[in-house]
């Protein structure tokens, strides 16, 4: 029994694809699980475009976060850490809008609601 809303499934699929690429396949079981469920969804060029855009965002976030997550942030100035935090926020805002677009593409009723937030809404694909 699956409990993930489709927008979360797609987001986690994109993360798993990035992780697979960045870790030489260390998460193969995880990726296979998401890919299997993804194959059960209706396919479309719009969905493929949204998935590619979300995957690109996750790659960009990975690039911005790696030093912070590996404990070598002392190599960065506070100004650079702040710049990265804002860039990550902006990428996440776009990611949330893409997730909601995915829900619309697949006619799924569950969307991510943000109130008084930069990520409110959808993105046209």
Region spans (language model):
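Anionic, Ser/Thr-rich low-complexity intrinsically disordered regions
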Residues: 1-125
């Amino acid at each position: 029994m699956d409990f993930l809303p489709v927008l979360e499934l797609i987001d986690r699929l994109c993360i798993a694809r990035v992780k697979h690429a960045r870790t030489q396949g260390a998460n193969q079981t995880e990726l296979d699980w998401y890919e299997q469920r993804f194959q059960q969804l209706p396919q479309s060029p719009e969905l493929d475009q949204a998935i590619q855009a979300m995957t690109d965002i996750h790659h960009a976030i990975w690039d911005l976060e790696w030093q912070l997550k590996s404990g070598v942030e002392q190599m960065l100035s506070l100004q650079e850490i702040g710049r990265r935090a804002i860039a990550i926020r902006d990428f996440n805002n776009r990611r949330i809008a893409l997730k909601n677009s995915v829900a619309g593409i697949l006619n799924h009723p569950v969307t991510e609601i943000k109130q008084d937030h930069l990520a409110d809404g959808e993105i046209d694909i």
